[in-house]
């Protein structure tokens, strides 16, 4: 929670489970909900949205015009959530998170962002793209694997929302929690990465070097503005 400047966080067994469990019970928390989902969202987000059994609208990938045109069709008092990622793993592009959050404010929508490929790697403390760009989405999904090298996933949000997920999500209620050993390891890793900004800088440098080497060898890669190298 502290990493993302949120009131509370809830740890689940993986980032996949955190996405699926959270999005899957949204309609119970917000009756009449409409979820607006980026067309390239991760399978875990898609699965969660399907489980929610609420109305959903797919918008073109990172397309602000298309997103706004779809938001305009919904009444301001209709509960809505914009679900998207910060860094997309397949194309390696970064979403315009500030502008999406601005649209959410304009049309009275909540924001749900998956920062799985960004936590530990962006921002002064490793809080992800949102920390780097100083924006505050309503709900953040992250992982304790990948950059942190341990296991587990989490969501971070305000206290009321976290309490609701804890009460409704079967994937949290009816399974064994992470072991204290893994929790201790994850906490130590988060603290370490927070304090060592040079690791984030080093990764970006190595990523750019690898991209150049592929290009020099004639191996095509997708151009992007993140650390991921899609060949």
Residue ranges and their predicted role:
Residues 57-113:
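Active-site phosphate-binding strand-loop segment of PLP-dependent enzymes
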Residues 131-164:
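Active-site PLP attachment segment
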Residues 14, 36-52:
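Substrate-binding/gating loop at the entrance of the active-site cleft, primarily
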Residues 181-201, 212-215:
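Amphipathic alpha-helix from the class-I
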Residues 1-21:
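Short loop-beta-helix segment that forms the pyridoxal 5′-phosphate
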Residues 201-208, 216-231:
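Conserved PLP-binding catalytic core of the aspartate aminotransferase-like
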Residues 22-43:
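Conserved PLP-anchoring active-site segment centered on the Schiff-base-forming lysine
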Residues 52, 106-107, 217:
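Helix C-cap/helix->beta junction micro-motif
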């Amino acid at each position: 929670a502290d990493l993302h400047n949120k009131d509370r966080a809830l740890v689940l067994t993986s980032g996949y489970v955190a996405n699926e469990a959270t999005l899957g019970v949204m309609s119970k928390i917000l009756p009449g909900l409409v979820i607006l989902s980026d067309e390239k969202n991760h399978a875990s987000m898609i699965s969660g949205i399907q489980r929610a059994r609420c109305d959903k609208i797919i918008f073109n990938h990172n397309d602000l015009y298309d997103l706004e045109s779809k938001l305009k069709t919904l009444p301001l008092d209709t509960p809505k959530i914009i679900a998207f990622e910060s860094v997309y793993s397949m194309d390696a592009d970064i979403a315009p998170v500030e502008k999406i959050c601005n649209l959410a404010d304009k049309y009275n929508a909540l924001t749900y962002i998956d920062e799985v490929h960004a936590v530990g790697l962006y921002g002064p403390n490793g809080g992800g793209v949102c920390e780097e760009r100083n924006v505050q989405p309503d709900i953040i999904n992250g992982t304790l694997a990948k950059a942190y090298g341990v296991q587990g996933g989490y969501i971070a949000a305000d206290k009321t929302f976290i309490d609701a997920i804890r009460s409704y999500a079967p994937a949290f209620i009816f399974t064994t929690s992470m072991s204290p050993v893994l929790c201790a390891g994850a906490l130590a890793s988060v603290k370490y990465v927070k304090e060592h900004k040079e690791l984030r800088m080093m990764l970006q440098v190595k990523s750019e070097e690898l991209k150049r080497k592929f290009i020099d060898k004639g191996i095509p890669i997708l151009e992007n503005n993140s650390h991921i190298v899609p060949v």
